[in-house]
């Protein structure tokens, strides 16, 4: 049974038998920010069900106190899947306001309580330029990953990225399936408009994180 803790869900109304549940998946928002996550885990422990498979999808931004890590460590079949869409400043831009150093510390903490760590990597028209360095880092860390291709919002999809960007990706082997000019590409001006609107809302500047992309926009 998959349990997705959300603010609108009343825990007592969740239909789950804590003594016999074999699988529970805790997804987003951010499970480690939601107190219900740990209430569920504590109830499983109370029912001596620490063999239940626990899957948690996190953005890796929250440093857990030792008490929470100790609680997680009681489960013998624990998978933690971390959403990582780049390294260093690329990660910080894609997952703002998360910090890269905090993520690294959290990965280290997770690896002390389970060997089953994986990465979910979402690829868009922004981070495709950093694809090789991203997967090189995954491989260096020895962490399994799966990738997802953005289709929505349209302006971030690989199919619809501006022609000017597609032309700069000629040497990017991974990007080749999306480089054909179809006529569905958005204009570079529209692309810039969306990026700048996003940056204003976050009070950040893309040039501080993705200078290669910023140079294309100027």
Question: Residues of each region from the PLM?
Answer:
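Core AdoMet radical
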Residues: 1-9, 18-35, 47-65, 73-104, ...
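Glutamate identity and glutamate-enriched acidic tracts
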Residues: 6, 10-12, 30, 42, ...
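Exposed alpha-helical structural elements
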Residues: 10-13, 67, 90, 187-190, ...
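A generic secondary-structure signal
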Residues: 12-14, 40-47, 70-71, 106-113, ...
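Conserved C-terminal portion of the radical SAM core fold
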Residues: 55, 76-81, 100-217
């Amino acid at each position: 049974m998959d349990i997705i803790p959300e603010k609108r869900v009343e825990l007592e109304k969740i239909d789950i038998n804590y003594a016999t549940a074999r699988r529970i998946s805790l997804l987003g928002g951010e499970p480690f920010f939601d107190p219900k996550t740990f209430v569920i885990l504590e109830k499983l422990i109370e029912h001596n069900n620490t063999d239940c498979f626990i899957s948690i999808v996190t953005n890796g931004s929250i440093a857990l106190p030792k008490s929470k890590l100790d609680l997680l460590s009681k489960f013998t079949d624990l998978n933690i899947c971390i959403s990582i869409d780049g390294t260093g400043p690329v990660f910080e831009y894609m997952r703002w306001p998360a910090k890269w150093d905090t993520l690294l510390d959290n990965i280290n903490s997770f690896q002390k309580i389970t060997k089953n760590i994986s990465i979910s990597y979402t690829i868009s028209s922004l981070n495709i330029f950093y694809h090789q360095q991203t997967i090189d880092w995954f491989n260096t860390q020895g962490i399994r990953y799966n990738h997802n291709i953005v289709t929505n919002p349209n302006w971030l999809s690989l199919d619809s990225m501006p022609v000017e960007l597609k032309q700069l990706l000629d040497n990017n082997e991974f990007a080749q399936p999306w480089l054909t000019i179809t006529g569905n590409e958005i204009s570079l001006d529209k692309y810039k408009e969306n990026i700048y609107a996003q940056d204003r809302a976050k009070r950040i500047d893309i040039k501080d994180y993705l200078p290669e992309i910023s140079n294309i926009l100027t």
